[in-house]
């Protein structure tokens, strides 16, 4: 009798739009389609890292219940429209951008003055309509985060949020807009009781649907790894002793991270040649590296996070035998 579980594979990725895709995976043992599909869906909706406006300062406005002369939208609707702008930051965790426009016409996300390491994914998104003589001057703080953070959490927790005229927004950081899944029947040879998992994913364009699935799977693996490391159980005692397996990504050189030349050279100067060497260093240790500043550190952290890794991780039996230095 077969006791090993079938291992599924992705058999199709169908693009349904620029940021919309359907991913089909099979075969799963019976029941595993719902088990894994629901887990992935929950992680996709709650745990993806993204970017969102968190604070807004509008010239001439003291609170969100104000109106502006020459602007069709009131401040509440203006804030709702600003929350619909999709930002993406590169190698930084926050930035403040400016929106200035005057004269009759439509104000869109493309009118926002951006820093070199910030971009707007939906520049055609409408923010406001100005009439003759209308003027808009807005400062927008954009931050990196995860999930949903109500504005009142920061409003009462940060002194900067108490400044008169600064409006704190509820922030939805998740780059995933919609996720659904369906479980269908699958067949392998004579077995007809297997599952096929079909996932439908739509993002806001900050990440692709395929990358969203990869990141959610890494999060699940990381969270479940603690259970695999349980000690003192009967199963562990009976298991044959063998050297722990090392994630292949840790054996890859830091050059594969495609860091800037400055960051890569700083790491090599500290004898950090492999990704496994890098993740064991803490932020404080890296900041002590000559010529490696906060900007380079943020770049390294972001690149590692995109692969489900962080600084300060602990590895047993590192470096493995036979690893060239």
Swiss-Prot record:
One of its GO terms (cellular component) is DNA-directed RNA polymerase complex. Residues 1-231 are annotated as: Alpha N-terminal domain (alpha-NTD). GO terms for biological process: DNA-templated transcription. Gene3D superfamilies: 5' to 3' exonuclease, C-terminal subdomain, DNA-directed RNA polymerase, insert domain, RNA polymerase, RBP11-like subunit. Residues 246-325 are annotated as: Alpha C-terminal domain (alpha-CTD). Its EC number is 2.7.7.6. It holds the Pfam family RNA_pol_A_bac. It catalyses: RNA(n) + a ribonucleoside 5'-triphosphate = RNA(n+1) + diphosphate. InterPro entries: DNA-dir_RNA_pol_insert (IPR011262), DNA-dir_RNA_pol_RpoA/D/Rpb3 (IPR011263), DNA-dir_RpoA (IPR011773), RBP11-like (IPR036603), RNAP_asu_C (IPR011260), RNApol_insert_sf (IPR036643). Keywords: DNA-directed RNA polymerase, Nucleotidyltransferase, Transcription, Transferase. GO terms for molecular function: DNA binding; DNA-directed RNA polymerase activity; protein dimerization activity. It comes from the Bacteria. The N-terminal domain is essential for RNAP assembly and basal transcription, whereas the C-terminal domain is involved in interaction with transcriptional regulators and with upstream promoter elements. Belongs to the RNA polymerase alpha chain family. DNA-dependent RNA polymerase catalyzes the transcription of DNA into RNA using the four ribonucleoside triphosphates as substrates. Homodimer. The RNAP catalytic core consists of 2 alpha, 1 beta, 1 beta' and 1 omega subunit. When a sigma factor is associated with the core the holoenzyme is formed, which can initiate transcription. NCBIfam families: PRK05182.1-2 (NF003513), PRK05182.2-5 (NF003519), rpoA (TIGR02027). This is DNA-directed RNA polymerase subunit alpha. It comes from Paraburkholderia xenovorans (strain LB400).
């Amino acid at each position: 009798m077969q006791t090993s579980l079938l291992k599924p594979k992705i058999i199709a990725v169908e693009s349904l739009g620029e940021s919309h895709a359907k991913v089909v995976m099979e075969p799963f043992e019976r029941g595993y389609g719902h088990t894994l599909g629901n887990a992935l869906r929950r992680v996709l909706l709650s745990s993806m890292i993204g970017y969102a406006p968190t604070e807004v300062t509008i010239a001439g406005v003291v609170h969100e219940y104000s109106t502006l002369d020459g602007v069709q939208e009131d401040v509440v609707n203006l804030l709702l429209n600003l929350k619909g702008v999709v930002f993406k930051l590169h190698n930084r965790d926050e930035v403040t951008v400016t929106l200035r426009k005057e004269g009759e016409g439509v104000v869109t996300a493309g009118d926002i003055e951006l820093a070199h390491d910030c971009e707007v994914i939906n520049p055609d998104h409408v923010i406001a309509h100005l009439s003759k003589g209308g003027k808009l001057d807005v400062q927008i703080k954009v931050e990196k985060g995860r999930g949903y953070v109500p504005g009142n959490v920061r409003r009462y927790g940060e002194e900067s949020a108490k400044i008169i005229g600064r409006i704190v927004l509820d922030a939805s950081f998740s780059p995933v807009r919609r996720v659904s899944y369906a479980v269908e029947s699958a067949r392998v040879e004579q077995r007809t009781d297997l599952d096929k998992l079909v996932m439908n994913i739509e993002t806001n364009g900050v990440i692709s649907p395929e990358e969203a699935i990869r990141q959610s799977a890494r999060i699940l693996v990381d969270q479940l790894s603690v259970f695999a490391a349980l000690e003192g159980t009967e199963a562990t005692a009976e298991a044959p002793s063998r050297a722990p397996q090392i994630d292949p990504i840790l054996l890859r050189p830091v050059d594969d991270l495609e860091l800037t030349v400055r960051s890569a050279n700083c790491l090599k100067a500290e004898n950090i040649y492999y990704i496994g060497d890098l993740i064991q260093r803490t932020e404080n240790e890296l900041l002590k590296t000559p010529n490696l500043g906060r900007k380079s550190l943020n770049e390294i952290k972001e690149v590692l996070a995109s692969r489900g890794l962080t600084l300060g991780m602990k590895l047993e039996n590192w470096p493995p035998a036979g690893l060239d230095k």
